[in-house]
């Protein structure tokens, strides 16, 4: 292509660039759902385009979520496109893992590599013919040219730019080379790239739906490569061709892609495609305000899934990283989010990932599950670790109901149940906190309790459940002239071995049921009522009293 032909094309590109690529939107337009969110009268089509080179990062998951919510809230299409042009790092296993994680989150897509669609293929590695077709169009129009510069020549240009303290833009001769010079190199078989001609003057502006007006000076860019010498297309060229030919109306992505928008806008213009609207969301930050990375702990969706987090909790928490509905409400189902999500409420400042808040959020969603699902989750967890041996007795149901308020992660249910079934009487009676309980004639309560158990009275009451317990404890209190805290605190310590915990009546009834049903495995640390009363009978109360006054050694035998 002769240089004179290109210069005419370049001049036309420069003159028409700003009004064609970036129609100015008023502040009012940016704030309204109709113009800013809908992108005009065409259908809403958004995409999430992961690279299958690793696990799905929470940042990528949030980007996918925002795209999903935007599409679903406007009756649009959510497209999944796999950007696998990095052939060395891309793997099928990683692609499958990303798709699995998206499905686990409940982010179903309308078009994608697994289900197809009208605008496929949906893997970049399968779209090379399309990229070559559009690269040829740019070559024929004069928007790109062949560059025969070697790596050594390009490196020298960078060194020169550094010495001159100017942006390292392309300064080679091939932008203005004659047809004869180009033909000579082609005949020699010299490798070449395709470079895009960038206007040397002017600026480019876009109105980002989140960040507002963003502009770049074109003289800082320089001519850039769109096709490598091995025929592989470059990222920005692929993305532009893909978004244009897939008719993407809105590009919602991370702010780290904002610099790419300049190159992509130029390619859109040169190919004659309409520009989508752009929305660049903030990065997710670590508590120290640095970019969230593996050194800060778990960062992938798969890791949180393995740790026992619920998908609905992950979705809820990720949505709140940079978005809110303007109220104090923090609990949202995915249907709530679809109903309330608007792009104008996405914050442009960085959002801090708080693992503690995520765990709290998971607890909220765990406890909001229908009772049958909640119980099944607990039961499945206990069975998977071998703690629960059977569930016919109703033990799992009662244990789940008793423990759910203190559990935020289902994987914590193991430790919670083991703690509930344990009997650390030795540690409790030896503690400073128990001193007042011991001094309140605890030995007398223990003596009466042992008598009630040996006679079968207590066992019968527990077998009758809560009604039986209430009758028995009322009678026991009258006999020993105790009520309120002076009755229930000693009973809690003597029967559970603890000063604090879930409701005492439910705890003791559950311990009784565990002993009679054989519901739990020995490795749970379960101490039966029989074993508890054996320990109680061996307590040397006189020695314990002295120990409280001057601690030397334990007066309470440890549970075996």
From Swiss-Prot:
Domain of life: Eukaryota
Family indicated by similarity: Belongs to the class-I aminoacyl-tRNA synthetase family. Glutamate--tRNA ligase type 1 subfamily.
Species per Swiss-Prot/TrEMBL record: Hordeum vulgare
NCBIfam families referenced in this protein's UniProt entry, alphabetically: gltX_bact (TIGR00464)
Positions bound to ATP: 57, 256, 291-295
'KMSKS' region (motif): residue ranges: 291-295
Substrates-to-products reaction catalysed: tRNA(Glu) + L-glutamate + ATP = L-glutamyl-tRNA(Glu) + AMP + diphosphate
HAMAP family the record matches: Glu_tRNA_synth_type1
GO cellular component: chloroplast; mitochondrion
SUPFAM superfamilies: An anticodon-binding domain of class I aminoacyl-tRNA synthetases, Nucleotidylyl transferase
One Pfam family cited in the UniProt record for this chain: Anticodon_2
Keywords of this entry: Aminoacyl-tRNA synthetase, ATP-binding, Chloroplast, Ligase, Mitochondrion, Nucleotide-binding, Plastid, Protein biosynthesis, RNA-binding, Transit peptide
Enzymatic class: ligase
EC nos: 6.1.1.17
Protein's job: Catalyzes the attachment of glutamate to tRNA(Glu) in a two-step reaction: glutamate is first activated by ATP to form Glu-AMP and then transferred to the acceptor end of tRNA(Glu).
CDD domains, sorted: GluRS_core
GO biological process: glutamyl-tRNA aminoacylation; post-embryonic development; reproductive structure development
Motif 'HIGH' region positions after renumbering to this chain: 50-60
Subcellular location(s) of the protein: Plastid, Chloroplast; Mitochondrion
Signal sequence annotation: none
GO molecular-function terms, A-Z: ATP binding; glutamate-tRNA ligase activity; tRNA binding; zinc ion binding
Family annotation (InterPro entries): aa-tRNA-synth_I_cd-bd (IPR045462), aa-tRNA-synth_I_codon-bd_sub2 (IPR020751), aa-tRNA-synth_I_CS (IPR001412), aa_tRNA-synth_I_cd-bd_sf (IPR008925), Glu-tRNA-ligase_bac/mito (IPR004527), Glu/Gln-tRNA-synth (IPR000924), Glu/Gln-tRNA-synth_Ib_cat-dom (IPR020058), GluQ/Sye (IPR049940)
PANTHER family: GLUTAMATE--TRNA LIGASE (PTHR43311), GLUTAMATE--TRNA LIGASE, MITOCHONDRIAL-RELATED (PTHR43311:SF2)
Identification of the protein by name: Glutamate--tRNA ligase, chloroplastic/mitochondrial
Residues the record lists as binding L-glutamate: 47-49, 83, 235-239, 253
